[in-house]
């Protein structure tokens, strides 16, 4: 929003306003954003929320594509995406805007291109967990832990642990496959209902116990998930040039977006899922951050955009 605010007045905030259309060089661009949003998300009424959900939509869509390409090695051996950045303040496919702000896509591309990446995929009534490697060496004695957790933080199935995994160089391999009803056999709700109340947390560790990759997987489209309402609490610690932000939510907060009114500010992470009871620390850096000066902060998550 801080980039849109550089070329459009708040009184004109509409997706099809004359100014917004002038800054959208695809004749079908804004309509296409809404079409895809209606498919996967609950479309917000507020303009600011529409912009935020549009960013989330772009990031998730591109991430799914990048992961599919990696998963289908050797038929696909690499991906370049359109586009990296912008030459002016505009609505576009870029992952970094004109002022150097990272969009959701840039964070999702960073995750999807991790050298070792966990990629679960549903096929009909089954779940297959892939390990994707772009490394040039084989990793041995890896451990993959998988937990199914509801949105309030309760584990709803026994954790699964795969030990002594080998991850060969430059490979895509399915290391775990199961039927969804077997995965959630201990739950009391019908399977179709339970899948809307939970997520899977997958963590890959090396032989020293260090986390190599972690993925949060949902079993349904975001618009179908029965996400809980929540308020994210946070604490800030500022010094010259940086702000340490610690976030906490009692229940799941999906697609958390942190924004400060500083063009080009860097975030150690953004557009992430904040897990129930998890304390997550984000480092914000900018030469404009000053110790002792209040830093205006916006923290938003998907559930807040529901009308």
Ranges and model annotations:
Residues 78-83, 257, 296-300:
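Conserved active-site loop/cleft motifs that coordinate metal ions or position small ligands
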Residues 127-166, 170-177, 198-205, 245-248, ...:
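Beta-strand-rich binding/interaction modules
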Residues 1-140:
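Substrate-binding clefts and catalytic carboxylate motifs of secreted carbohydrate-active enzymes
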Residues 227-275, 282-285, 302:
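C-terminal accessory/binding modules appended to enzymatic or scaffolding proteins
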Residues 144-193, 263-290:
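Intrinsically disordered, low-complexity Pro/Gly/Ser/Thr-rich segments with frequent PxxP/GP/PP motifs
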Residues 179-229, 287-307:
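Terminal connector regions
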Residues 113-124, 219-240:
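Extracellular ectodomain segments of secreted/surface proteins
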Residues 123, 138-140, 192-196, 239, ...:
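Solvent-exposed loop and beta-edge segments used for protein-protein assembly and interaction
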């Amino acid at each position: 929003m801080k980039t849109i605010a550089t070329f459009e007045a708040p009184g004109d905030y509409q997706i099809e306003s004359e100014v917004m259309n002038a800054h959208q060089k695809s004749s079908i661009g804004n309509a296409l954003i809404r079409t895809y949003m209606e498919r996967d998300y609950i479309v917000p009424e507020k303009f600011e929320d529409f912009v935020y959900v549009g960013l989330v939509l772009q990031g998730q869509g591109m991430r799914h594509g990048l992961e599919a390409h990696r998963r289908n090695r050797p038929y696909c051996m690499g991906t370049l995406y359109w586009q990296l950045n912008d030459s002016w303040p505009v609505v576009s496919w870029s992952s970094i805007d004109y002022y150097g702000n990272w969009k959701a896509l840039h964070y999702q591309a960073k995750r999807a291109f991790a050298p070792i990446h966990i990629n679960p995929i549903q096929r009909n009534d089954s779940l297959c967990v892939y390990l994707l490697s772009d490394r040039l060496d084989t990793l041995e004695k890896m451990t993959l832990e998988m937990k199914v957790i509801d949105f309030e933080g309760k584990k709803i199935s026994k954790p699964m642990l795969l030990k002594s995994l080998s991850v060969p160089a430059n490979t895509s391999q399915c290391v775990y496959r199961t039927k969804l009803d077997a995965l959630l056999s201990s739950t009391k709700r019908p399977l179709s209902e339970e899948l809307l109340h939970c997520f899977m947390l997958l963590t890959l560790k090396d032989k020293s116990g260090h986390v190599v990759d972690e993925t949060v997987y949902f079993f349904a489209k975001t618009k179908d998930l029965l996400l809980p309402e929540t308020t994210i609490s946070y604490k800030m610690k500022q010094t010259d040039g940086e702000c340490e932000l610690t976030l906490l939510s009692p229940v799941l907060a999906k697609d958390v977006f942190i924004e400060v009114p500083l063009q080009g500010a860097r975030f150690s992470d953004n557009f992430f899922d904040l897990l129930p009871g998890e304390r997550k620390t984000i480092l914000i850096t900018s030469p404009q951050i000053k110790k002792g000066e209040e830093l205006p902060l916006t923290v938003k998550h998907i559930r807040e955009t529901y009308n």
